């Protein structure tokens, strides 16, 4: 089993979790292929984490399974936008920590 962590990704964790749930339990090669054609911005970061986890273990993508894909909330960058009458409104720019673990696929006995 090997893992990869990408920290401080400028992406909302709620949006990234939608993609992380899709690839969990998938074959790594199939997960990378499906993430390549997803229109979401977070798919690129999760694909990078999966390929990094595969490389960290010294595996080939077709022989491993994404055992866990987790997206945790990172620190929130706070900005202000000037508004009418001298006031300001908050802008929250959330960040995420993407954690991916891959492990060898269990061989099914026939």
From Swiss-Prot:
UniProt KW Ribonucleoprotein keyword = yes
Region Disordered: start-end pairs: 85-110
Could you list this entry's UniProt keywords, alphabetically sorted. Answer: Ribonucleoprotein, Ribosomal protein, RNA-binding, rRNA-binding
Q: Where is composition skewed (Basic residues) in this entry?
A: 85-95
Name the InterPro entries for this protein: Ribosomal_uL22 (IPR001063), Ribosomal_uL22_bac/chlpt-type (IPR005727), Ribosomal_uL22_bac/org-type (IPR047867), Ribosomal_uL22_sf (IPR036394)
Residues folding into a coiled coil are none
Do you know which Pfam families this protein is assigned to? Answer: Ribosomal_L22 (PF00237)
GO terms (BP aspect): translation
Write down the Gene3D superfamilies for this protein, in alphabetical order.
Answer: Ribosomal protein L22/L17
Q: GO cellular component terms?
A: cytosolic large ribosomal subunit
Q: Which domain of life is it from?
A: Bacteria
Which SUPFAM superfamilies is this protein grouped with?
Ribosomal protein L22
One annotated GO molecular function: rRNA binding
How is the quaternary structure described?
A: Part of the 50S ribosomal subunit.
Q: Which family does it belong to?
A: Belongs to the universal ribosomal protein uL22 family.
Summarizing the function annotation, the protein's role is: This protein binds specifically to 23S rRNA; its binding is stimulated by other ribosomal proteins, e.g. L4, L17, and L20. It is important during the early stages of 50S assembly. It makes multiple contacts with different domains of the 23S rRNA in the assembled 50S subunit and ribosome. The globular domain of the protein is located near the polypeptide exit tunnel on the outside of the subunit, while an extended beta-hairpin is found that lines the wall of the exit tunnel in the center of the 70S ribosome.
Matches recorded under NCBIfam families: rplV_bact
Question: By what name is this protein known?
Answer: Large ribosomal subunit protein uL22
Q: Which organism is it from?
A: Campylobacter curvus (strain 525.92)
């Amino acid at each position: 089993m090997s893992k990869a962590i990408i920290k401080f990704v400028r992406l909302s964790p709620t949006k990234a979790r939608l993609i992380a749930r899709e690839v969990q339990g998938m074959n790594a090669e199939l997960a990378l292929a499906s993430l390549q054609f997803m229109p979401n911005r977070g798919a690129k970061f999760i694909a990078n984490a999966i390929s990094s986890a595969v490389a960290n273990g010294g595996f080939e993508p077709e022989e491993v399974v994404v055992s866990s894909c987790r997206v945790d909330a990172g620190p929130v960058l706070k900005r202000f936008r000037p508004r009418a009458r001298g006031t300001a409104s908050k802008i929250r720019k959330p960040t995420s920590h993407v954690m991916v673990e891959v492990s060898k696929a269990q061989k099914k006995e026939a």
